[in-house]
Amino acid sequence: LEKTKAEWVIWSAGTFQFLIYKRMVANDNWYIGAGGKGGPSRTNAIDRDACIHFIRAALSSSTITKFLIISALSSRRDRAAWWDDESWAMARKINEEMPTYYKAKLAADETLTALGEQKKGFGYIVLRPGGLTDDKEVGKISFGKTKARGMVTRGDVAEVAVKLLEKESVRGWFDLLGGEEETDAAVERVLREGINSMEGEDLEAMKKDVAPL
């Protein structure tokens, strides 16, 4: 990271790297890290350990000002206030079916959040899409606080990621599904209204669980 003199870090997986790259090809101030696929050991090594290493390195860097991680909609400890019991049960079921992935993602999300909150002026972005499709980008989304289950195209996720990075002073968790609102309008609305889907999570507990820099 020091060698590249990057200002932003994007931690993503698979085809997101290429999709985000296409949208940011004119910029030279960012670095993309790849998320992991495979068995539990690889998931922990990449989605948890390597990601946390990059988070800590980014926050210790003198040049990096933003870190965006592509997480998952169900990656949270507590029920979102805008979800009903059925929605929360559905999210928990997803996490129980993929426990290693869930725990790895949550550890990375909470590390970025806890440490990002403690560094003044640092932009931390936890982008949390639902189920992913390879369909053509739609350009219409549900963003900020969404229902607990749904689909979104990878292209739409990449587009939202770029729009968030291009804004100043963005911090927080942002849920994302396909929807009916134009992408530009949705992003502007959520940032203007200060919507953060971390609401309901225990930030102080995160800070206690995460070792300081």
Question: Predicted regions: what is each one?
Answer:
Residues L1-S61, L165-E168:
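NAD(P)H-binding glycine-rich loop region in Rossmannoid oxidoreductase-like domains
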Residues F16-Q17, S61-K66, S71-L213:
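Oxidoreductase cofactor-interface core, primarily capturing Rossmann-like NAD(P)-dependent enzymes
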